[in-house]
From Swiss-Prot:
One of its GO terms (biological process) is proteolysis. This is Lipoprotein signal peptidase. Keywords: Aspartyl protease, Cell membrane, Hydrolase, Membrane, Protease, Transmembrane, Transmembrane helix. The chain crosses the membrane at residues 2-22, 59-79, 81-101, 122-142. The gene is lspA.
Length: 148
């Protein structure tokens, strides 16, 4: 269990560090192409959730985040002997805290990864942690279902 705590901390530092770098080095609303026709770093502010849903509802995000972190903390402890769930929950905690830090500190979330080959919302490291965390939870649930 204790191996996952440093992972959470490292992911949060990576998320916050990249967000800081983007904010300092790329002008708001502009992009720097990393891989032509594939990926750009774009400095955008998102005061909503994915696809800017619930834009400007910071109180709502604060309450939901605190409740979610409480639940994740409970499952982090309860499922501490299951490495697959621990990996998933650790990613979910890192992603949740990464974006929560932005919301509390800035009032918005800094997003930066823009896919150039398809129309997809701009996202950040915390969003990737959340996405992979959910995918791993689904895999763990399917695995548990097969084991029964």
């Amino acid at each position: 269990m204790w191996l996952y705590i440093p992972m959470i901390i490292i992911l949060i530092i990576a998320d916050q560090g990249l967000k800081f770098w983007i904010s300092v080095n790329i002008k708001l609303g502009t992009s720097q192409v990393i891989l032509p026709n594939v990926l750009a770093l774009t400095n955008v502010r998102n005061d909503g959730a994915a696809w800017s849903v619930l834009s400007g509802q910071q109180w709502f995000f604060t309450v939901i985040t605190i409740v979610a972190l409480g639940l994740m903390g409970y499952f982090f402890w309860k499922l501490r002997s299951d490495n697959l769930y621990m990996l998933a929950i650790s990613l979910l905690i890192a992603g949740t805290l990464g974006n929560f830090i932005d919301r509390i500190r800035l009032g918005y979330v800094v997003d930066m990864f823009e896919t150039l080959f398809m129309n997809f919302p701009i996202f950040n490291v915390a969003d990737m942690c959340l996405t992979f965390g959910v995918i791993i939870v689904i895999i763990a649930l399917i695995k548990d279902e097969k084991d029964e």
